[in-house]
């Protein structure tokens, strides 16, 4: 008997068969304690490492859509100042003047970005080796990274037990989950500092477009610090919900122009009005979904600070989608800052990035 399938039934059948497949990871050890955890999913391949619980590579066919270095990871990442693909914390972004008050107590942090603290300070978790285990499952692989952030290391209150769970599935979706608990009331604002570039030729990302129901950009003052909690609506400014990076960089709007000229591009927190935003070019669509209140977009505006043969990058070689609380929220919002984590209160956050190829 011959079975006839509609296209819809065939697609459902193929999807069921794909999602029923076991997925596997392979570990490759390099020098300096770096392990590369490689997951192959037919059209796509993704690589993580225990150094900074970071993403190293994400290839669609032969096109690497993130910035990084697999072959020389043992040398590349320890010398790299740009946090490529790293888990950042305990606090992502800048804290102005490296100080904050919590319950009327003033905390002095290490200043590692001029007079400011950035990304948790010089002993941030992007620079450490995480313990990890791998769970190979039907339709996905989980890599569970664990560490403890000590107050003695970064001068924030409280020690934090942290799990960072990277999951990759058959639908080419990469999910990051953060689970944490602190011994004291503290600040906790983790994020991943992956740089994306969806161009097949690795050209600058000016041709990428961002879209969401709302694209409210918080303006920056001196030293890239958010100066006001009143953002600028790019949707209203450009009369578009789908806006190309190039149009933002070259805008004649007085406020946008001043910000772009001052900072060389975007390095701004956004309120996207919901949980999802999209970035696309003519080849790919990248969808990010998050439960965090803000997304910081950084378009890699200055690449001159790394004197190394590894530094092959120019301005706008990539862009970040850092899902987090707005940087410096503790000094902007005081005891209403969403980054405040109570003692022994479980923290959970989830962000996913899904890549798909456009059908031309």
Regions found by a protein language model. Give the residues of each.
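An exposed, glycine/acidic-rich loop-and-rim segment of catalytic or binding clefts
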Residues: 7, 11-360
